[in-house]
């Protein structure tokens, strides 16, 4: 019996873990740029292994990059992101996020914030607001204050016995928001970075150009069980 149990354990299949870190030394290999704006040029560049993504003043530019693969599932996602100083009221977001569709999306979006957001986060004059959002199933958003500069953003999708996720948003190694969500590894995500002039993160159209920087993006996850985009 002992030998049988040992053999059974040895033959049990291991869960496939996929792991990668993009440091952008090879440009945006594995990614593609897309936008929702009127810019005539692509607003990104890579210099010395740092990915820069930009928007223009007095526009509602939305500059984004996404992974080519869409099968990322439960596990840990990390972004090393530089948040620039943002002028009071300017509507701009520096984003680090996961996306399947408009109902399956988990975000970090960092901007100056509206007066209401800044009050909720108790943001000081030299701070910006990091909005942590699950777009649906259920919808939830929370705001915390951080200073401009380099930060480590992390989203963890932890599997529960009921087949659903607990999602955890962490900043610089500290968990800042936790949510039980109503879907699980059947949903395959793409990974995104972005700088977007979004109205919800300020009070006025941006009066300045903005650039967010990404030193690296990494993950250690399992593949989703179903990855067809809906």
Name each model-derived stretch.
Residues 28-52:
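Extracellular glycan-recognition surfaces and repeat-rich motifs
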Residues 7-8:
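C-terminal motif of bacterial Sec signal peptides marking the signal peptidase cleavage site
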Residues 76-78, 183-230:
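Ligand-recognition surfaces built from glycine- and aromatic
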Residues 79, 148-159, 167-169:
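Short tryptophan-centered beta-strand motifs in secreted/extracellular beta-sheet-rich domains
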Residues 13-33, 228-230:
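Extracellular carbohydrate-recognition regions
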């Amino acid at each position: 019996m002992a030998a049988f149990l040992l053999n059974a354990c040895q033959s049990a299949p291991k869960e496939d873990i996929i792991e990668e870190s993009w440091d952008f030394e090879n440009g945006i290999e594995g990614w593609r740029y897309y936008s929702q704006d009127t810019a005539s040029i692509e607003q990104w560049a890579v210099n010395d292994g740092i990915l820069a993504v930009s928007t223009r003043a007095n526009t509602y530019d939305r500059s984004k990059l996404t992974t080519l693969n869409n099968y990322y599932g439960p596990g840990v996602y990390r972004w090393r992101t530089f948040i620039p100083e943002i002028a009071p009221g300017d509507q701009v977001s520096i984003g680090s996020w996961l996306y399947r569709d408009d109902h399956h999306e988990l975000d970090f979006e960092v901007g100056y914030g509206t007066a209401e957001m800044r009050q909720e986060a108790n943001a000081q004059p030299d701070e910006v607001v990091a909005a942590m959002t699950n777009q649906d199933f259920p919808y939830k958003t929370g705001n915390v204050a951080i200073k401009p500069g380099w930060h480590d953003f992390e989203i963890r999708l932890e599997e529960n016995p009921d087949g659903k996720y607990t999602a955890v948003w962490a900043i610089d190694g500290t968990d800042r928001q936790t949510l039980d969500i109503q879907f699980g590894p059947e949903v395959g995500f793409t990974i995104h970075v972005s700088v977007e002039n979004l109205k919800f993160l300020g009070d006025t159209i941006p009066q300045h150009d903005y650039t967010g920087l990404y030193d690296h993006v990494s993950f250690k996850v399992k593949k989703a069980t179903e990855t067809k985009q809906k």
